[in-house]
């Protein structure tokens, strides 16, 4: 006896007419018969045919039967196939006609219908309920790729481990940074504010900031102090014209005000006079302090790049190397006048993104970073390319204060350990 499952594996799908013709020949040739218990209604079989459409007709295979006899027996045979269906149910279950006339019809042998038996040696025809469908591995790969694209990467709760830390202010941290984003526009200055300065230029500003970064490092001040110092300088210069000989004094007073706002231990005025090589007196410092506070309307509490940088590094799950490298890159941006066009949050996000690319050699800007930073990777690319160019010339430029600072053991020689992410600049072509 032939195993039906083995036949089904190697069986070539034949048209339904050939299968039934073979069935007819075998049933006439052999006398041994068996009952078919799994006969299905015409409508059920018709629905499971591959490419077939339902058509309510039955074609007699006997060659001598005329067309008129065939049409007259249609209704009888349909009724015999559905003996338990009432007339009302029959009306509700009318079959849908096919688009062609006889190409999709089901052929039924009258001898089969009378005897309903086949020989034991006859192999069972392939089941019509599960039609053969050719497997296409390429189609499955495409479907798997589409499914991977549709699956979004989960956003991590970066404050989960600080839930029991009262100093982390987990309950308010999201509200705090929402407020910072709303008010950071007041920290920004016009890109062309140097045009109203008659005696100073953007290069002089760069020299001043580079020198103040060294002073900040010598005094071992907090990072917040440095970013607030630069912010006070830019905001003041955007509103007040300053003579060249007073520019260094503006920088010293901005540092003094930032220390008073951020530091616990503040440098005394005499220390600032000394580091200026006594170019200014104590009276000059105090007088400029009054002018600067009056010009800025005593508004000192504005978000800078640093609080955003801390938050975004946390979202990136950074290690010490990433933190130091991101700080190095964002301090390079402080010196460059062209970077004042970008808001503090964008500069901070770009520093983290560029540091990731520099260390790993590829982008790691995931959904968690994008959610907490509110910037997509495409929004960072323009600023990122500028930052990479600053990194490329950091050690060879005229102003190397930031590079020298981060080339020390205190910062793990980070400035000399990693080359700039050149591939980010080359991708811009």
UniProtKB/Swiss-Prot annotation:
<dbReference type="Pfam" id="PF02984">
    <property type="entry name" value="Cyclin_C"/>
</dbReference>
<feature type="region of interest" description="Disordered">
    <location>
        <begin position="66"/>
        <end position="98"/>
    </location>
</feature>
<keyword id="KW-0132">Cell division</keyword>
<dbReference type="InterPro" id="IPR006671">
    <property type="entry name" value="Cyclin_N"/>
</dbReference>
<keyword id="KW-0131">Cell cycle</keyword>
<dbReference type="GO" id="GO:0051301">
    <property type="term" value="P:cell division"/>
</dbReference>
<dbReference type="Pfam" id="PF00134">
    <property type="entry name" value="Cyclin_N"/>
</dbReference>
<dbReference type="GO" id="GO:0016538">
    <property type="term" value="F:cyclin-dependent protein serine/threonine kinase regulator activity"/>
</dbReference>
<protein>
    <recommendedName>
        <fullName>Cyclin-B2-2</fullName>
    </recommendedName>
</protein>
<comment type="subunit">
    <text>Interacts with CDC20-1 and CDC20-2.</text>
</comment>
<dbReference type="InterPro" id="IPR048258">
    <property type="entry name" value="Cyclins_cyclin-box"/>
</dbReference>
<dbReference type="InterPro" id="IPR004367">
    <property type="entry name" value="Cyclin_C-dom"/>
</dbReference>
<dbReference type="InterPro" id="IPR039361">
    <property type="entry name" value="Cyclin"/>
</dbReference>
<keyword id="KW-0195">Cyclin</keyword>
<dbReference type="InterPro" id="IPR046965">
    <property type="entry name" value="Cyclin_A/B-like"/>
</dbReference>
<feature type="compositionally biased region" description="Basic and acidic residues">
    <location>
        <begin position="68"/>
        <end position="80"/>
    </location>
</feature>
<comment type="similarity">
    <text>Belongs to the cyclin family. Cyclin AB subfamily.</text>
</comment>
<dbReference type="InterPro" id="IPR036915">
    <property type="entry name" value="Cyclin-like_sf"/>
</dbReference>
<dbReference type="InterPro" id="IPR013763">
    <property type="entry name" value="Cyclin-like_dom"/>
</dbReference>
<dbReference type="GO" id="GO:0044772">
    <property type="term" value="P:mitotic cell cycle phase transition"/>
</dbReference>
């Amino acid at each position: 006896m032939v195993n039906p499952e083995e036949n089904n594996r190697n069986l070539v799908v034949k048209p339904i007419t050939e299968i039934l013709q073979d069935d007819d020949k075998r049933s006439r040739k052999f006398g041994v018969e068996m009952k078919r218990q799994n006969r299905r209604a015409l409508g059920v079989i018709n629905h499971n045919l591959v490419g077939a459409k339902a058509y309510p007709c039955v074609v007699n295979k006997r060659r001598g039967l005329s067309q008129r006899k065939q049409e007259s027996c249609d209704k009888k045979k349909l009724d015999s196939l559905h003996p338990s269906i009432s007339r009302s149910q029959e009306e509700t279950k009318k079959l849908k006609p096919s688009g062609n006339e006889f190409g999709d019809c089901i052929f039924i042998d009258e001898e089969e219908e009378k005897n309903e038996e086949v020989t034991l040696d006859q192999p069972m025809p392939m089941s019509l309920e599960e039609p053969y469908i050719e497997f296409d591995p390429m189609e499955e790969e495409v479907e798997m790729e589409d499914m991977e694209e549709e699956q979004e990467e989960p956003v991590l709760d970066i404050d989960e481990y600080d839930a029991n830390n009262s100093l982390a202010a987990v309950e308010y941290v999201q509200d705090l940074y929402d407020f910072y984003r709303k008010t950071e526009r007041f920290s920004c200055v016009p890109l062309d504010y140097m045009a109203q300065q008659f005696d100073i230029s953007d290069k002089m500003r760069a020299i001043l900031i580079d020198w103040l970064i060294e002073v900040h490092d010598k005094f071992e001040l907090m990072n917040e102090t440095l970013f607030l110092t630069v912010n006070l300088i830019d905001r003041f210069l955007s509103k007040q014209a300053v003579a060249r000989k007073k520019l260094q004094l503006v920088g010293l007073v901005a540092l003094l005000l930032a220390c008073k706002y951020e530091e616990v231990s503040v440098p005394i005025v005499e220390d600032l006079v000394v580091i200026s090589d006594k170019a200014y007196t104590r009276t000059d410092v105090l007088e400029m302090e009054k002018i600067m506070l009056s010009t800025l309307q005593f508004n000192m509490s504005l978000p800078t790049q640093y609080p955003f940088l801390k938050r975004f590094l946390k979202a990136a799950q950074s290690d010490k190397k990433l933190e130091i490298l991101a700080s190095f890159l964002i301090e390079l941006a402080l010196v460059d006048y062209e970077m004042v066009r970008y808001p503090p949050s964008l500069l901070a996000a770009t520093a983290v993104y560029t540091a990731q690319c520099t260390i790993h050699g590829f982008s790691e800007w995931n959904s968690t970073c994008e959610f907490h930073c509110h910037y997509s990777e495409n929004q960072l690319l323009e600023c990122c390319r500028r930052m990479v160019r600053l990194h490329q010339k950091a050690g060879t430029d005229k102003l190397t204060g930031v590079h020298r600072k981060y080339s020390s053991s205190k910062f793990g020689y980070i400035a000399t350990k990693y080359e700039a992410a050149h591939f980010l600049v080359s991708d811009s072509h």
